[in-house]
Amino acid sequence: SSQGVDYCKIKCPSGIHTVCQYGESTKPSKNCAGKVIKSVGPTEEEKKLIVSEHNRFRQKVAQGLETRGNPGPQPAASDMNDLVWNDELAHIAQVWASQCQFLVHDKCRNTAKYPVGQNIAYAGGSNLPDVVSLIKLWENEVKDFNYNTGITKQNFAKIGHYTQMVWGKTKEIGCGSLKYMENNMQNHYLICNYGPAGNYLGQLPYTKK
């Protein structure tokens, strides 16, 4: 997926590229000690679900059918792309997921093509939480979003997963994941990378129709 790319040449203001720092391997790192890793990376079926759930939700918002918000409803969009899966984004996301640095964003995940955004979700239980339930955690942040305010330093922590999900100009997605047992719980950890990135402070996630 990323053969022949020298990620050490891809610069980010915030630091060294994940694949430059950790290498191409997606094998779980020493940090994962104590966790019984059941599987690394989404299945083909899960990849389809990730894309279809994102596009279902993006279309719902674009059509003006999302009634939640602070205040709701969310305005319809005139520039909402449908997302497609990108293996390079997924590979970079998986290298980072396999480091077991939980709920922390990596410093640099860009590709030669564009800057890359990121959403992270995690859930555990006696049954394995499915991938769509993780994505819905991001969608649910819409309840706190005021479209007219856009993205600010103050609200970013509460709404940033939602706004990246519905960033109109984003076109591609690729995700990494780990499923593992710990303390008798089945855990599902998901990292999705988005290109081109969204979530610029002071900007609106999409153009109002």
Swiss-Prot record:
Record InterPro entries: Allrgn_V5/Tpx1_CS, CAP_dom, CAP_sf, CRISP-related, V5_allergen-like
Keywords: Allergen, Disulfide bond, Secreted, Signal
Location (main, coarse): secreted
CDD domains with a match to the protein in the record: CAP_euk (cd05380)
SS bonds (residue pairs): 8-20, 12-108, 32-100, 175-192
Cellular component terms (Gene Ontology): extracellular region
Tissue specificity note: Expressed by the venom gland.
Ranges for domain SCP: 52-194
Domain of life of the native organism: Eukaryota
Signal peptide: 1-4
SMART domains named in the record: SCP
UniProt keyword Transcription present: no
UniProt subcellular location: Secreted
Pfam families documented for this protein: CAP (PF00188)
Family: Belongs to the CRISP family. Venom allergen 5-like subfamily.
Protein name: Venom allergen 5
Record organism: Polistes annularis
